[in-house]
A protein has these predicted regions:
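Thiol/selenol-based redox catalytic cores and closely related redox-interacting motifs
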Residues: 305-390
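Alpha-helical membrane-anchoring segments
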Residues: 1-276, 281-308
Length: 390
């Protein structure tokens, strides 16, 4: 995992937690209060296993303030401000809420807690974080492997626990899910309900098989990305048809953390040339980032000749005999970086080009006003210096 990949994960994960807590805030008193659904904390099966200050008879206002406070801390985590203390506070709050009301349990809760612990153990100094950059930053291999081992074991264990359930073995679980009051109304649910019962049974058994086989398939490098993707698609499907997205969103966080950038190689595999506005501070920072992330060293840089080439609000990407500009150029750069950046490029191509180009032009016209001016070639980093061409 590269420094920028971890930064991307940190932003998404912190944002997810902030939204989670903000959605929880209006119901904090009802869920965790002395006059709520579980007024006596000793009724929880896990009571006494965790030193929980929420066992005190707190007012609804205090509980709401606590949950909002956790949302604010989540934003600090996303912004890279005091990441490690924020992770400790969030882990404690996350655990305390569960032990105050075990009825909120769902399979993603322990994985979110795991990610908070791992986020605490990852060294500091990643991009967009408080404090100096660590040029030698690296994700500890044991952290990445721990996440993979526990995720794979959890999925297979989940499949094993489903085997005694008649609805999973006879294939009717999917139909029960779609008929459940929590099913999300809409065309997707209606479409799935219109499918033959035999196909719904195959979907049920396929889901069960994917969970059971996750651990053994994760042990083999060739099948690992495919079983990872299968469960990602399963969770996206659950979000589409079940009106309880929090379970799957939490699991998607562990999938984001365990994504291996080596699965998506740079494309194209031949070098490309980026011609950029050297007076634009945003452009300067962007090419420094690209040079840092270009592990395959496929990208070269040259400042635009504004008078001879193109108006300064454009960036050109030369790939073979093609010259790309605007959003097509950005997507070509992301594809060349490979990994999660290539995945973002694949998603970006699903957006109609006029919309992509419109957003590009909107930012380009305001880049000097928003970001100022700066010379990318004045003090280039080592990664950039060797890529600049006259």
């Amino acid at each position: 995992m590269s420094p920028w990949q971890f930064t991307l994960f940190r932003i998404v994960f912190g944002s997810y937690l902030a939204v989670h807590f903000l959605h929880l805030a209006p119901w904090a008193g009802e869920l965790f209060g002395k006059d709520g659904v579980l007024p006596d904390p000793t009724l929880n099966p896990t009571h006494g296993l965790f030193p929980n200050p929420l066992d005190l008879p707190l007012s609804d206002g205090m509980l709401t303030a606590l949950v909002v406070f956790l949302a604010v801390v989540s934003l600090l985590l996303a912004a890279g401000r005091w990441r490690k203390p924020a992770a400790v506070v969030l882990w404690f709050g996350w655990t305390a809420l569960f032990h105050r009301n075990n009825l909120i349990a769902n399979p993603s809760l322990p994985y979110v807690g795991l990610l908070l612990v791992l986020t605490l153990l990852v060294p500091g100094g990643e991009p967009w974080s408080r404090g100096p950059r660590n040029a030698d930053w690296a994700m500890p291999k044991w952290v990445f492997r721990t996440a993979w081992i526990l995720m794979a074991a959890g999925y297979t264990f989940s499949g094993i626990t489903k085997l005694p359930s008649e609805s999973w073995t006879d294939g009717t679980a999917m139909k029960f899910l779609l008929d459940n009051p929590l099913a999300r109304p809409g065309w997707m649910r209606d479409l799935m309900l219109s499918l033959p019962d035999g196909l719904l049974k195959l979907l049920t058994w396929g889901t069960l098989a994917a969970e059971l086989l996750f651990l053994p398939l994760a042990l083999w490098s060739r099948t690992r990305p495919w079983i990872w993707l299968t469960l990602v698609l399963m969770h996206l499907g659950i979000i589409a048809v079940v009106d309880f997205a929090d379970l799957s969103l939490g699991m998607l966080m562990i999938h984001l953390f365990t994504f291996d950038p080596a699965w998506l190689r740079p494309r194209p595999s031949r070098p490309i040339l980026i011609r950029f506005d050297g007076d634009c501070l945003m452009c300067s920072r962007t090419i420094r980032f690209v040079a840092e992330e270009d592990r395959a060293k496929l990208i070269r840089f040259r400042p635009l000749d504004v008078e001879g080439d193109r108006a300064p609000d454009s960036m050109l990407v030369e790939s073979g005999d093609r010259t790309l500009d605007r959003s097509d150029g950005v997507l070509a750069i992301l594809s060349t970086l490979g990994g999660h950046w290539r995945a973002m490029a694949m998603a970006g191509r699903l957006i109609p080009r006029p919309l992509r180009d419109g957003l590009y032009r909107f930012i380009a016209k305001r880049r000097y006003r928003w970001f100022g001016k700066g010379d990318a070639c004045a003090l280039p980093s080592e990664a950039l210096k060797e890529r600049l061409v006259p």
